[in-house]
Amino acid sequence: MGTQILSKTTHHLLSVVGKLCVIAIMSEISKLIVDSLKAYYITKEGIVKAVDSVSFEIKGIESFGIAGETASGKSTLGLALLRSLQPPGKIVGGNITLQGQNISNMSDDEFNKTIRWKKIAMVFQGAMNTLDPVYTIGSQMSEIIKEHRVDVEQESLIYNSLMQVGLDPSVSSRYPHELSGGMKQRVVIAMALLLDPDIVIADEPTTALDVLVQAQIIELLKTLRKERGLTVILITHDLNLILEFADKIGIMYAGQLVEFGSANDLYLNPRHPYTQALMASIPRLHSVHKDLQFIAGSSPNMLELLPGCRFFSRCPFAKELCREDPPQIKLEKGFVRCWLYK
């Protein structure tokens, strides 16, 4: 009897150790590598370098947050990863490697058949307001399945996706105007999950929702990440939100990733002057500084970018050397694009 109990205990321990080993291995495997990605808008007025030589890496079970002010290039980066940029937007350089496969040179047809919605999906900014008012939720979800996958049980996929986001499957027979803002946001998240992707890009998923519903949506994304092993790339201007959610954070400014690192490191020890200014602008519970700080000046005109650091005109530490393009300095847990650390 004692031997049987010992055997069961040993088996259980081995099972637990095995699972921990799998998690440890997964955490070291690169799921997404973005190398020197460039996405520009080529207009009559000039070229807008919305995403300019952006590089980062996401490993197996990490969540990634992209923060920055309006027009910093966050949404363009998300669209570029899904290859959903519309003219005059265009990817003009760089590489995207997904789970060891370089997907940058894939034809549009191959990308659509094998990657879009199947491996990478996106909850677009304001997507809940683009649901077609004359079609039921179920019929709109069916269109996604028809476009990207054939010979599958549509009802089963729709049922499972709605259940995963905490909605009753009966929602599929309802129209958008019959749903609350929070329910509509859950619907567009369910749409992104339909074909079981490995990565979901969520662009400002809590915009226009009240505080309670915002918290519910973020908790939903956390749950999906935990239960499905889903990698979520959260794009937002809300630093508090991103610090709460993400393992790693990238700070974008004027089309460039100026700092990248762990959420804890960026919060406790921000390096780039822009990151420092952002962190100083959010309230902290135990801060000795009672007054919030604000960033003077405004972002540069993206059509008239000068050589050098793009934060130059607003930086309190700017020096003559900063008129030259700053190098990307590798740190222990990330990098910073700034001459101060050369």
For each feature predicted by the language model, list its residue ranges:
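P-loop NTP-binding/switch modules centered on Walker-like glycine-rich loops
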Residues: 69, 201, 205, 209-290
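A short, proline-enriched helix->beta-strand linker immediately N-terminal to the Walker B motif
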Residues: 194-198
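A short, flexible loop at the N-terminus of ABC-type nucleotide-binding domains that lies
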Residues: 28-31, 40-53, 84-89, 107-111, ...
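Short catalytic/signature loops enriched in Gly
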Residues: 172, 262-342
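Conserved ABC ATPase signature
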Residues: 175-179, 183
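ABC ATPase NBD coupling module
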Residues: 90, 103-121, 147, 265-270, ...
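Conserved ABC ATPase "signature" region
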Residues: 102, 153-170, 279
